[in-house]
């Protein structure tokens, strides 16, 4: 008794999950409103964007916003240009075009959730490929492979990425502590630097 050949699975040459219109709307809203920036950064990170240029724009906007600088098309284009990334991000005209995608800046958080969901789906696809590779390679104990596969899926479900993010308050506190530790030996009793 022979079994019928297996049906081919879904093609891996398909485009990964994405919503470019949502990405453009998020960025356009951020370029239009500080409130939109505050809403969006609660939902997504730069790595959540499908288009690399969008990640560059997002990171530049959030850098400007984090420094208390205005983040509009002019300042964002200038910052990207100083970094040598303006053309990779699409250029000045593309930044202006992003503003045309915005109907209501109040919807920015909703669009950001769409971007976040698509990013999770892309990570799930990537994780499934890694899990399939683990299974095909079959290196190590089966229980260890299963554990690694489960951890891979868990990381996707908790939105972990290769970059670990920490709240700014933690970073500032640890940086301040390090600076104090460096400065302490240089200070003479009485709090003044030695002559």
Feature map (PLM): residue ranges:
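Noncatalytic partner-interaction/assembly domains of nucleic-acid and motor enzyme complexes
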Residues: 1-120
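Conserved catalytic-core motifs characterized by acidic clusters
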Residues: 6, 139, 165-168
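The Walker A/P-loop phosphate-binding site
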Residues: 31, 163-195
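Short, flexible helix-adjacent loops and helix caps
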Residues: 42, 69, 136, 161, ...
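Alpha-helix boundary/capping detector
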Residues: 52, 83-88, 137-141, 158, ...
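Generic structural concept
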Residues: 54, 58, 77, 125-128, ...
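Extended, charged alpha-helical coiled-coil/arm scaffolds that mediate oligomerization and mechanical coupling
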Residues: 92-162
């Amino acid at each position: 008794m022979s079994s019928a050949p297996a049906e081919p699975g879904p093609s891996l040459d398909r485009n990964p999950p994405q919503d470019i219109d949502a990405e453009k709307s998020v960025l356009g809203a951020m370029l239009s409103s500080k409130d939109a920036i505050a809403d969006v950064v609660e939902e997504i990170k730069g790595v959540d964007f499908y288009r690399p240029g969008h990640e560059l724009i997002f990171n530049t906007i959030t850098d400007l916003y984090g420094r208390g600088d205005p983040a509009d098309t002019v300042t964002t284009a200038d910052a990207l240009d100083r970094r040598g990334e303006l053309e990779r991000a699409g250029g000045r005209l593309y930044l202006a075009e992003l503003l045309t995608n915005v109907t209501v800046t109040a919807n920015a958080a909703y669009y950001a959730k769409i971007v976040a969901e698509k990013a999770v789906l892309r990570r799930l696809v990537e994780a499934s490929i890694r899990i399939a590779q683990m299974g095909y390679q079959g290196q190590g104990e089966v229980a260890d492979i299963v554990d690694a596969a489960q951890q891979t899926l868990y990381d996707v479900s908790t939105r972990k990425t290769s970059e670990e993010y920490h709240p700014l308050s933690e970073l500032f506190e640890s940086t301040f502590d390090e600076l104090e530790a460096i400065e302490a030996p240089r200070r003479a009793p009485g709090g003044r630097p030695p002559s």
